[in-house]
């Protein structure tokens, strides 16, 4: 059967999982392997997401399940994003228990983060609905690679998101992450149109996506689509996972990217991992 969650449209045989390792064909029905089974829980400052213009100075309960529908060669959380549920320790935590845990630790919101939360969409929606009923925020930290119909089911419960816009080149997306650019742009626009507070992160990798003309095109697209006020975070790359042979991003490259963004009309530009 074919999964309709993301643009990969995986054809999944009986008893098998798709590319994300978290959705299984069980008798012709797609089920989430990781529903209510988070592998990571933490209390983080909201700025760590990073979200700089959404209730700064507050904390959030961060939650992640295993799996991702990208294969980023530079993934900093590959131990869990590229793992199956059986590969890692995990908790048993229902949506109501997540909300109770959040309130117990006096966090005003929940962040679905660290891996690709959209691969466990059902768990997020059920948790996010209860979170809203309890007066809590819902925050998504995502690469944004999802089909628009399932995304619509989540948007009413989403308050803020940081979208990892990995480059402004479809070729780089295919080469580095195994996906495509346009669905990510569609996700950003859908979030904006739904009234979700959006911030953008762009990890600048030397020799991969550090061409300033491409950075300019990305910033121009953001401005042209009404996102000039969306904070843009240029993040510094460090060697990791399958990109151990690439040096850290020079600070002058990040500063050049910031200058380009400001020239194009981005109002809030930040440098991360510096």
Predicted features by range, described:
Residues 1-65, 78-82:
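N-terminal [4Fe-4S]-dependent radical SAM core
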Residues 4, 66, 70-73, 129, ...:
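Core alpha-helical elements of the protein kinase catalytic domain
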Residues 9-42, 216-218, 222-274:
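A broadly conserved sequence feature marking short terminus-proximal activation segments
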Residues 16, 68, 169:
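A generic "binding-loop/recognition-motif" signal
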Residues 60-62, 66, 70-108:
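Glycine-rich active-site/cofactor-binding loop and its immediate structural neighborhood
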Residues 72, 163, 269:
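Conserved, mostly hydrophobic/aromatic
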Residues 95-249:
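Conserved AdoMet/S-adenosylmethionine-binding subsite of the radical SAM
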């Amino acid at each position: 059967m074919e999964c309709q969650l993301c643009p990969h449209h995986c054809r999944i045989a009986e008893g098998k999982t798709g590319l994300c390792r978290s959705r299984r064909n069980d008798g012709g029905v797609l089920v989430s392997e990781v529903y209510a089974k988070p592998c990571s829980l933490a209390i983080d400052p909201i700025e760590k997401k990073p979200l700089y213009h959404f209730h700064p100075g507050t904390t959030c309960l961060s939650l992640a399940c295993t799996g991702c529908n990208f294969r980023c060669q530079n993934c900093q959380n590959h131990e869990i994003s590229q793992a199956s549920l059986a590969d890692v320790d995990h908790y048993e935590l229902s949506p109501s228990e997540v909300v109770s845990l959040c309130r117990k630790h006096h966090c005003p919101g929940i962040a679905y983060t660290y891996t690709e939360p959209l691969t466990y969409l059902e768990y997020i929606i059920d948790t996010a609905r209860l979170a809203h009923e309890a007066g809590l925020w819902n925050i998504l930290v995502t690469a944004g690679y999802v089909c628009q119909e399932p995304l619509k089911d989540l948007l009413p419960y989403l308050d803020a998101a940081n979208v990892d816009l990995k480059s402004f080149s479809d070729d780089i997306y295919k080469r580095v992450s195994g996906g495509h650019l346009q669905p990510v742009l569609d996700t950003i626009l859908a979030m904006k149109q739904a009234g979700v507070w959006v911030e953008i992160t762009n990890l600048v990798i030397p020799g991969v996506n550090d061409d300033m003309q491409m950075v300019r095109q990305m910033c121009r697209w953001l401005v042209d689509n009404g996102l000039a006020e969306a904070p843009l975070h240029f993040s510094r790359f460090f060697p990791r996972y399958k990109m151990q042979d690439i040096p850290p991003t020079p600070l002058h490259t990040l500063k050049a990217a910031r200058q380009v963004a400001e020239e194009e009309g981005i109002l809030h530009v930040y440098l991360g991992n510096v």
